Regions:
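N-terminal Rossmann NAD(P)H-binding glycine-rich loop of SDR-like oxidoreductase domains
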Residues: 57-81
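N-terminal chloroplast transit peptides
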Residues: 1-38
Length: 318
């Protein structure tokens, strides 16, 4: 088999993987509540033993009950942060065994609300004391793609979007709302380092690499809209600097070693990166990505776009 043929086959396998398993972010089933506290706090099996005076800060994690969001909450708590999660689900999905622990006090403050509604975010920040926001809201297949029901099988959170779940509303609008509120909050409180961490995608940088625009040109329209939404948020965050410190992570495929169903896609991404396809970055474990994001929040010198080399440096590979 020639090198060209091998690369073509890997590229084809990668494109299939991209279409079906690109990412595992969360957007939970809808609720009519603007922003409320669920009846219980859910256990994430991590305890924050630091006092408020020792804490590196207090953060709001948007989409904190999803695949990546839960990992960020756990890691942030372990690093000493005070953590509030906002999602439409309110509480993360729990097994029957885990549900028996709900009466125990845990340190992550889970709130139920819709980040498409600005009031949901501003109400939480108005409580004061926040030093950063992490945006982990997203979805692979939106309602306009005609494939939204497949999210139950390819989404890390197994969420099914509602009729109003489009890339523009879920990715762009929720992030724009949060960025605008964060900017106002930082100015009002005279904060010199309010961090905003956004989960973008490696493919958002395709225009800057060889072959990127060519590959993007053959993607279905719904995947192009996915990338348009990511890029619009990146631009919005950059425009908000230096009032807020922009942290933009661009992971490739996000996976977890305890989910073997993702290994087909992971192998395709690793193979494409190994043979030198410039438009394919290495996959990253959800644990490594979460650690990267939390370390970036703590380190005031970290800002801008973080691709795989930076993710590997900050968060490792495990």
């Amino acid at each position: 088999m020639t090198t060209t043929t091998s690369r073509s086959r890997v590229a084809l396998q990668w494109i299939i993987s991209f279409l079906w398993f690109r990412t595992s972010l969360s957007f939970a089933p809808a609720t009519n509540k603007s922003c409320s506290r669920p009846r219980h706090r859910a256990p994430l099996f991590v305890k924050n033993n630091s006092s408020p005076s020792d804490s590196p800060g207090k953060i709001l994690v948007l989409g904190g009950t999803g695949f990546l969001g839960q990992a960020v909450c756990k890691r942030a708590l372990a690093e000493g942060f005070q953590v509030t999660s906002l999602s439409r689900r309110g509480l993360p999905p729990l097994s029957d065994e885990d549900a028996t622990l709900l009466s125990t006090t845990f340190d992550i403050d889970f709130r139920q609300g819709d980040a498409r509604n600005k009031a949901s975010v501003s109400k939480i920040l108005s409580e004061g004391g926040y030093t950063g926001i992490v945006h982990c809201i997203g979805l692979l297949l939106d309602e306009d793609s005609g494939l939204s029901l497949l999210n139950e099988f390819v989404s890390g959170s197994r969420s099914i979007p509602d009729a109003d779940s489009t890339y523009d509303k879920i990715t762009r609008l929720t992030a724009f709302n949060a960025i605008e509120i964060a900017t106002e909050y930082a100015l009002t409180n005279n904060l010199d380092d309010f961090a905003f961490c956004f989960t973008s995608a490696a493919e958002a940088g395709w225009p800057d690499i060889p072959g990127g625009e060519l590959v993007e040109g053959i993607l279905p329209d719904f995947m192009k809209r996915y990338l348009v939404a990511k890029r619009s948020v990146e631009a919005k965050i950059k425009d908000a600097a230096p009032t807020i410190r922009p942290i933009i992570v661009r992971p490739s495929l996000i996976y977890s070693k305890d989910r073997p169903e993702s290994f087909f896609s992971v192998s395709a991404f690793f193979a494409g990166n190994t043979i030198g396809l410039p438009f394919i970055d290495k996959p990253v474990t959800v644990q490594a990505l979460a650690l990267t994001m939390v370390k970036a929040l703590k380190d005031k010198s970290v800002s801008g776009i973080l691709r795989y080399p930076e993710i590997e440096r900050l968060g490792g590979t495990s």
